[in-house]
A protein has these predicted regions:
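Glycine-rich NAD(P) Rossmann-fold beta1-alpha1 loop
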Residues: 11-17
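Short amphipathic alpha-helix with an adjacent loop that forms part of the alpha/beta core around
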Residues: 41-47
């Protein structure tokens, strides 16, 4: 584990885990050793040489467990190379991207002592069939179409750039 890179993620409906797994696969293709874990399961960062953290921006905020992870491990993360990603808009509209980028920048500014080697916002996935309480009770959300604007090529390119920065 001493030479491993940790990818820690928070997810509500599985989309961010899929992105974390893709990033891990790309880093492994570059010859790096990678562990992928939900942020809630990470007890220590001892033995990791770098950390990638990802979570969706959901209802205008990064998932709480991801923010808690950064807070809980703040001291260690300031000494390691860190990359951060977020999944954001589920519709490819310029206004949505602009607003979501502002939200992501606001989240990052809350952790001003962290200086990520990379921070990226990707499109997200929305599937009303996966909604859980209380969101599954909101009629407008239930009527929205399934949409997935995750750009797997962009995610792969970002992961390859991380291999150089974290490797």
């Amino acid at each position: 584990m001493a030479d491993s890179i940790l990818i820690a993620y928070a997810t509500r409906y599985g989309s961010t885990q899929e992105v974390a797994d893709r990033i891990a696969a790309m880093l492994r293709e570059s010859g790096l050793t990678v562990d992928v874990q939900p942020v809630k399961q990470v007890q220590t960062l001892d033995g990791y040489r770098a950390v990638v953290v990802g979570a969706p921006l959901y209802m205008s905020d990064w998932l709480k467990e991801a923010r808690n992870f950064l807070s809980r491990h703040r001291a260690t993360l300031t000494r390691l190379p860190v990359a951060i990603f977020a999944l954001g808009p589920t519709e490819d509209k310029e206004k949505d991207w602009t607003e979501t980028r502002k939200q992501f920048d606001k989240v990052l500014s809350q952790f001003h002592r962290l200086t990520p080697v990379a921070a990226e916002l990707f499109g997200g996935r929305f599937d009303p069939a996966r909604l859980t309480f209380p969101y599954n009770l909101i009629p407008g959300l239930k009527r929205m179409p399934v949409n997935d604007i995750r750009d797997w090529e962009a995610i792969g390119a970002w992961a390859k750039s991380l291999a150089e920065k974290l490797g």
